[in-house]
Amino acid sequence: MGMAMSENLLRYGNVAKPLVLYNRTREKAEAHSSRLGDCEVANSLPAAVSVSDIIWLCLQDQTAVEETFQEILPAEIRSKLFVDSSTTNPETADSIARRLSDRGAFFVALPVMGGPPLALSRSLTCIASGDRESVDRIRPYIEGVGEKPGAALLLKLLGNFLIMATIETVAEAHAFAEKCGIDTTNMDKLLRAVFPLPPHALYNRQMVTGECFSGKPLVEVSKALQLTGHVMEMAKKHGASVKIYEIARQHLEIVQENAGPDADITAIYGAVRMESGLPFSTITE
């Protein structure tokens, strides 16, 4: 994701060149730099921060975000703008914003929705929150939603709720149809007629073709479980009823148990099939 985003910033963002890159695995940054050109790989995170006015981060999980900012905060960062496109919980985003502000720096939370293919095609949905002046500095790329950084993460989590509910709905529809003796082809036609556009069409294709069991994952189930954990925490904190989401998360756990942590998120279909007395996968040896 970060590689696709940095490529688009370089190609279309009218940024100063060379673009400074940093990755904890230096070999990845070197290979990415060689492929793109007009890039410079920093030897360390503080070195990357020191020569940059805007520092854009996209990290794997909340632990990586917290560790990275622990390394950044002692440096001279006054007047620098940090844009974080990682997915954390809202409290973490607000805490980082406060700590950066105490050091005279600025922060925009910019979680994104969509996988690497959408990032490459410049089709990600970006949700920005931060003080107005900071958001204005990156406005050529996004539309802001407010001044509290945690608001962006809340919207990202709500977006994930919609995604998981959609996957669960499509999976249950297919399993229901099969148990009733409806041919997969006819159910596919119905879904494409009623919901011809993404996301329903995308998840339907994954399930009908069997790619949810054997293809390259849209999102690994292990990462989906991390994110759904944040959503469940938010729902519990605010007293919200999210029963369909709870069921979808339980199905993710079943997927991980049966197909491993790298299985696709849409293999929820397999969990629903098992509960309906069908084989987990539609693919036969």
From Swiss-Prot:
Domain of life where this protein originates: Eukaryota
Swiss-Prot/TrEMBL keywords: NAD, Oxidoreductase
GO MF: NAD binding; NADP binding; oxidoreductase activity
Listed EC numbers: 1.1.1.-
Positions that bind NAD(+): 87
Function: Nonribosomal peptide synthetase that mediates the biosynthesis of usterphenyllins and uscandidusins, p-terphenyl derivatives. Within the pathway, ucdB alone catalyzes both reduction and dehydration of atromentin to form a terphenyl triol intermediate. The pathway begin with the biosynthesis of 4-hydroxyphenylpyruvate (HPPA) from L-tyrosine, possibly by the aminotransferase ucdG. The nonribosomal peptide synthetase ucdA then condenses two HPPA units to produce atromentin.
PANTHER family associated with the record: 6-PHOSPHOGLUCONATE DEHYDROGENASE NADP-BINDING DOMAIN-CONTAINING PROTEIN-RELATED, OXIDOREDUCTASE GLYR1-RELATED
Protein name: NADH-dependent oxidoreductase ucdB
Organism: Aspergillus ustus
Gene name for this UniProt entry: ucdB
